[in-house]
Amino acid sequence: MAQQAAAHAAVVRFNFTGTQIISRQVEELRAVLAEVRRRQPGCKLFLLGRSLGGAASIITAAQDGALDGLILWATPNNLRFTFRYVMTEDEYRRLDSGETLHFNDERGECALMPDFLTDFDQYDLPALLQKAQPLPVLVLHCSADEVVLAEQAQRNAAAIGNAAELHIFEGGDHSFTEYSDEAGALLSDWLGKRLKCGAC
């Protein structure tokens, strides 16, 4: 996907520090934007965020007010609903009641603190999407996403209104395993149309 986007623009890729509250992810993303602007003043800027990174991108776009576009890849519309859906009922209840959860994932042993959930409460993603308008937004999702239900993409597009371009791929999972090339080509075309006037 980054290679396809790179046909039209310079691409900066980074990973958020793991298991952080979303407010910290927003801080990291804003720091990256500041560095890009320092190095390339006047450059057109588009944010692409996947899953929770898409939510951080929504928040950042609303706060920034000077971006040129937003791409939401398998992005939630309601953060608490998303985690209530993917966690067991017991895990969610324990975390929501103030208990720290310990687990292992691809990064090794991790701890999920209660403020991971409570931090969500200050962010109304549909309202933030509306605040970011008239920013053009490409919304990409798979209909069989097992983590972020496709209806959340539809709600994101509805909140955006006419500035949204929604594409839901039939079947497919949260990682776009079957559709990464197709989605990447669509993304590249969308970017290309918006960068015809020139960019970094």
Label every PLM stretch briefly:
Residues M1-V12:
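Short amphipathic alpha-helix adjacent to the substrate-entry channel of hydrolases
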